[in-house]
Curated annotation (Swiss-Prot):
Keyword set includes Mitochondrion: no
MF terms (GO), sorted A to Z: DNA binding; protein heterodimerization activity
Origin superkingdom: Archaea
Family annotation (InterPro entries): Archaeal_histone_HMF, CBFA_NFYB_domain, Histone-fold, HmfB-like, TAF_TATA-bd_Histone-like_dom
Native organism: Methanobacterium formicicum
Function: Binds and compact DNA (95 to 150 base pairs) to form nucleosome-like structures that contain positive DNA supercoils. Increases the resistance of DNA to thermal denaturation (in vitro).
Site (Interaction with DNA): K13
Entry protein name: Archaeal histone B
UniProt cross-references to Pfam families, sorted A to Z: CBFD_NFYB_HMF
GO cellular component, one term: chromosome
Subunit structure: Homodimer or heterodimer with another histone. Dimers then assemble into higher oligomers, with the DNA wrapped around the protein core.
UniProt subcellular location: Cytoplasm; Chromosome
């Protein structure tokens, strides 16, 4: 999965950067994808533990807190 690069650039600019290189966009996108997959994996475990097949927002929120 690849996150769209334009929103990644906006995230960096919203953090205060005036200009953002393509390499910086790609590096942040990769980091976010890796972290997102880790969070999603934990959220799936939480849903399964609760006896559900559906991952809820509360599973994701708890996964973020636990990691």
């Amino acid at each position: 999965m690849e996150l769209p690069i334009a929103p990644i650039g906006r995230i960096i600019k919203n953090a205060g950067a005036e200009r953002v290189s393509d390499d910086a966009r790609e590096a942040l996108a990769k980091a976010l994808e890796e972290k997102g997959e880790t969070i999603a994996t934990e959220a799936v475990k939480l849903a399964k533990h609760a006896g559900r097949k559906t991952v809820k927002a509360s599973d994701v929120e708890l996964a973020v807190k636990r990691l």
